[in-house]
Amino acid sequence: MSSRSPKDLIKSKWGSRPSSSKSDTALEKFKGEIAAFKTSLDEITSGKGKMAEKGRSRLLEKIQVLEAEREKNVYYLLEKDKEIQRLKDHLRSRYSSSSLFEQLEEKTKECEKKQQLLESLSKETDVLKNQLSATTKRLSELESKASTLHLSQSMPANCFNSSMNSIHEKEMQLKDALEKNQQWLVYDQQREAYVKGLLAKIFELEKRTETAAASLTQQMKKIESEGYLQVEKQKYDHLLENAKKDLEVERQAVTQLRLELDEFRRKYEEARKEVEDLNQLLSSQRKADIQHLEEDKQKTERIQKLREESSIFKGKLEEERKRSEELLSQVRILYDSLLKHQEEQARVALLEQQMQACTLDFENEKLDRQNMQHQLYVILKELRKAKSQITQLESLKQLHGFTITEQPFPLQREPESRVKATSPKSPSAALNDSLVECPKCSVQYPATEHRDLLVHVEYCMK
């Protein structure tokens, strides 16, 4: 038997078992990371997520941490390989049993599995690096597109950038959650492998104790008579008791590890459910963001269409305004011409009234002239009669001239009285007694001055 106990060998080979305080701190840390992930996702859904640069820096930090852990695990595995090789050499020198070599082979296989897990972890880090480079390239392309789009349409570009930033942030959060999930899976597998190895070693130790006890009983039967072997028997009994105690301790450790494994499995299931919920939420948020982007695109197209229609309507409105101005000018011209026409009509009506008055005056003057002509005709007729009477009187005077010379003076008066009796008034006196009036101003002229009356009538009619 080795001077070192099986517990010390297990601890030296697999490292000390994590205490309950460390598991509690890891659990609290995991809960805090889940709460931070939830708050960051809530901030993303509410439009308050961080920028894409912060997400990239965070992913780089995660990758650096994973690389550091990978290097640490590589160093740890190298140390474990050295320890395993040392144990192989020690066991080869101490024991020649094939079962121990088989156990060591199993341990080496487990180490190879851990190495494969480490390689898979490194591959995952490389994949994450490639994804990071692809996402950075895509983000640069989207930023260039967004900058070109921002020159034409600022508001849709801002919405697009914010939505892309939120989508990128959600992708980063999801990648972080997947990385943590993968780490927990690796840790769970390692713990399960450790528990299986520990159980196998405990089973092997039980077999070894049984075989050692059987061999000891046989040896004790063979060398009961020998007294110097009593000390060895006590020594082996003491070692057997110690091995049983260590076995009991390891059994308790196994039960504790099983409980912790069940607890971590439960936590892993909860975390997996939360990750699934977050994936569903992220997918729904992506659909909503895509729908918002489509709606923003439709809104921008509609705004552009409305702008074009408004420009067309503005052109038509300008044309209608020019036409209305032209029509107003034409209406003003027509109104002015209408006013002039009305004035001309008023003047024409006034002239017509004046013409009617003139025609009426002319008719009146014509009637007056006809009356005057009739009066002149009557006067001329009377003048002719007066002239004929004068000629008759002169002829009678000449005829009676002789008788007047022969008779005395009284006889001469008798014919005059007779003449006066025969012609009570002379023609000149009759003409002087007749008066003629102007038809317009009613000025009276004697019949003897009829020529002056004609001149006055012509002057008065002008």
Swiss-Prot record:
Listed Low complexity bias regions: 12-23
UniProt superkingdom: Eukaryota
Main localization (coarse): cytoplasm
A GO CC annotation given for this chain: midbody
Residue span of region Disordered: 1-26, 410-430
Self-association state and partner proteins as the record states: Homodimer. Interacts (phosphorylated on Ser-423 and Ser-426) with PLK1; the interaction is indirect via the MTMR3:MTMR4 heterooligomer, occurs during early mitosis, regulates the phosphorylation of CEP55 by PLK1 and its recruitment to the midbody where it can mediate cell abscission. Interacts with AKAP9/CG-NAP; the interaction occurs in interphase and is lost upon mitotic entry. Interacts with PCNT/Kendrin; the interaction occurs in interphase and is lost upon mitotic entry.
Alphabetized UniProt keyword annotations: Cell cycle, Cell division, Coiled coil, Cytoplasm, Cytoskeleton, Mitosis, Phosphoprotein
Residue ranges, compositional bias (Basic and acidic residues): 1-11
Record has Cell wall biogenesis/degradation as a keyword: no
Gene: Cep55
InterPro entries per UniProt: CEP55, EABR
Localization, UniProt: Cytoplasm; Cytoplasm, Cytoskeleton, Microtubule organizing center, Centrosome, Centriole; Cytoplasm, Cytoskeleton, Microtubule organizing center, Centrosome; Cleavage furrow
Modified residues (Phosphoserine): 96, 99, 423, 426, 428, 434
Protein name: Centrosomal protein of 55 kDa
GO molecular function, one term: identical protein binding
PTM (free text): There is a hierachy of phosphorylation, where both Ser-423 and Ser-426 are phosphorylated at the onset of mitosis, prior to Ser-434. Phosphorylation at Ser-423 and Ser-426 is required for dissociation from the centrosome at the G2/M boundary. Phosphorylation at the 3 sites, Ser-423, Ser-426 and Ser-434, is required for protein function at the final stages of cell division to complete cytokinesis successfully.
Region of interest (Required for localization to the interphase centrosome and to the midbody during cytokinesis), residue spans: 354-462
Keyword Heme in annotation: no
GO biological process terms on file: cranial skeletal system development; establishment of protein localization; midbody abscission; mitotic cytokinesis; regulation of phosphatidylinositol 3-kinase/protein kinase B signal transduction
Region (Interaction with PDCD6IP): 160-214
Coiled coil: 50-400
Region (Interaction with TSG101): 157-235
Naturally occurring in which organism (per UniProt): Mus musculus
UniProt-listed Pfam families: EABR
Function: Plays a role in mitotic exit and cytokinesis. Recruits PDCD6IP and TSG101 to midbody during cytokinesis. Required for successful completion of cytokinesis. Not required for microtubule nucleation. Plays a role in the development of the brain and kidney.
